[in-house]
Amino acid sequence: MTEASLELLAPRADVWGFLAEPYHLSDWWPGITGVDPDLRGFAPGARWKVHSTKRNIFTGSRVVETMVLIREIEPYERWSWHLLQPPTDVEVRLHAVAGDRTLVRVAVSRGNPALAIKRLYDLVQTAAEL
């Protein structure tokens, strides 16, 4: 697993509230452009249909669908999921730090977790400024 971490300028409860909303996944997870959660929403065992755009220099862009399986949730501390295509295991951990800040750690079996953390940082920072 490859891991990245960054301190966010928001309390852990606010960051968790953002992460626990299925529709926000496409706002911060690279490559995902839309989410259709099942009726369980943010719960272990839930399956979310996710959309992404595949780009090919010969055939152009096309929308593809895959599935996210929510594995484990420890409220305000961690959650893990598995993306079916491309096969990727993900774990997000939150740690409260001084001054109403949150240390977020993202570990992935494939890809660059720093991209997700940077997008999450930008979104949380924007919300904190509103």
Regions found by a protein language model. Give the residues of each.
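Secondary-structure transition/hinge residues
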Residues: 23, 27, 56, 125-128
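Well-ordered beta-strand positions in beta-sheet-rich domains
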Residues: 3-7, 63-67, 89-91, 105
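Hydrophobic ligand-binding cavity/cleft-lining segments
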Residues: 1-43
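Glycine-rich portal/gate segments that line the openings of hydrophobic small-molecule binding cavities
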Residues: 36-86, 99, 115
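Beta-strand/loop substructures that line and gate deep hydrophobic ligand-binding cavities in soluble
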Residues: 77-130
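Hydrophobic pocket/interface hotspot
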Residues: 14-19, 25, 50, 70, ...
